Amino acid sequence: MNQSQLVSVSTVWRYPVKSMMGEELNASAITASGVLGDRAFALIDNETGKVVSAKNPKNWPDFFSYRAAYALPPAADSLPPVWITLPSGRMVRSDEPDVDTGLSTALSRPVRLASFAPQAPSLEQYWPEHEGQANEVSQEGVAGDAPTGTFFDYAAIHILTTGTIDRLRSLYPQGRFEVRRFRPNIVVDTGELEGFVENDWVGGVIRIGESVCLQITDPCPRCIMPTLAQGDLPKDLGILHNGIMHNKVHVPFAGKALPSIGVYARVISPGVIRCRDSVKVEI
């Protein structure tokens, strides 16, 4: 194996509730289920039984206006309640008896907050028109390569590099390419390395800090989510058409080439990661 030393972990992110805004961290435990407390909760649509996701903005147009944060630091043996800030500024807590009522009222649709995924969970994913294809909504499974009962789209860890962000900015300078558009768990500062750096990592492993080891399994396919407005970031379909579409690569779990940004990873060895930890990649 060829081994190269990268610069460091740039940032670490956790999203307590699936598809809501999350938390930037200085450090986190990495467990078999990924960043401790990541996507531990999700909303379930009571009418369809599907997991609520910003991937279908037709049904959930303002979901990125909701923000989730733990009331206390999570522990490996128990997770504390989560505070959810609604677009109105009102806050509800996951352990309140009327939390489902508050969320349903805010969303104008009956939902329930869940901490364990239902059997065979799925969500609706909207694909905007591109390359002559009509707009469509597909039904997608959840947690394909992640532990049972979790709410990950596919894998427990999502990694992005600064090299990729820089490449996207060069392709579409008018677009605001920021890390939060892509919702990674770990951002790796690749220094002077240029381009879609992590494409070459698929099939290899990366070692972070003293003990964490991750196997890179697949590129991360992209849909509508990175183009959506969130906070001061505007809605911009050019993010997809003029940026992401330039990186169509083979995705093993899909069996075809798809527009992708970042990579998915499986946890081999758990531990703790911190910002500025060294990162080594073995390909």
Regions found by a protein language model. Give the residues of each.
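Metal-cofactor-dependent catalytic cores
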Residues: 1-283
